[in-house]
Design a protein with these regions (language model features):
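Conserved positions within compact, well-structured domain cores
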Residues: 25-219
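Bacterial Sec-dependent N-terminal signal peptides
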Residues: 1-27
Length: 219
């Protein structure tokens, strides 16, 4: 009798443990999608998310992703060799010149609908129509982009990013993936980059590195 009770107890304990793991997994998979995007009055009608993929507030870093990957990983695994599309030391697998709204677009995969990674044109439009200010929000350093059209703004934290054994440039630089691969170098993709006195976008950023993603909303 005691043996049967012990077996039942172990079974119930295991079931409860599995439910706890499943609940945590489910919770982690649920991405907090914004109720609405921020309208900066941009000519194209494109709107920007108020926070990053994996975050729930503008000042939160959210999750870090290698370019074209849609899952997070151990910070020590943001390397060339651990990149999902690593082919060999001379090249990465080509997954497309622009991955916006594809299976490789983490914003589109996680948030679905009309959300996607920003393109080069989206970021150019943002910089052409917004004033940039290096500032703090709730103690977090980052960049404020304020529309010169309607005064609305978005804040992007200077989250830096993981690369090999370091998480670099926290509070110093913001790096955000764009949807375009660098046409001049298979290893690299485009990013929006900003610091205390400079904001620009361009290629030259290794696709295997971890960066934040700030989605845009397009109808």
């Amino acid at each position: 009798m005691k043996a049967k009770l012990l077996i039942m107890f172990i079974a119930l304990f295991a079931l409860a443990g599995n439910n706890g793991v499943n609940a945590q997994t489910k919770k982690k998979k649920n991405q907090p999608v914004p109720a609405e995007a921020v309208d900066l009055g941009l000519p194209s009608g494109t709107k920007w998310a108020p926070y990053n993929v994996g975050a729930s507030k503008p000042e939160e870093f959210g999750d870090f992703y290698a370019w074209g990957e849609t899952k997070t990983k151990n910070p020590l695994r943001y390397t060339k060799e651990d990149y999902r599309y690593y082919k060999n030391r001379r090249e990465y697998v080509n997954i497309g010149d622009d991955i916006s709204r594809t299976e490789y677009d983490v914003a589109h995969v996680k948030w679905e609908g009309n959300w996607c990674m920003p393109t080069k044109d989206d970021v150019k439009e943002l910089l052409d129509n917004c004033k940039f200010m290096w500032t703090k929000v709730n103690g977090v350093i980052g960049g404020m982009f304020t529309s010169i059209i309607n005064g609305n703004y978005i804040f992007l934290p200077a989250a830096g990013g993981p690369w090999y054994e370091e998480h670099r440039y926290v509070g110093e630089i913001g790096k955000y993936w764009l949807s375009a691969q660098d046409p001049d170098d298979n290893f690299n993709a485009y990013s929006l980059v900003f610091g205390s006195n400079r904001t620009f976008w361009g290629g030259g950023y290794d696709r295997g590195a971890g960066q934040c993603v700030r989605p845009v909303f397009k109808k």
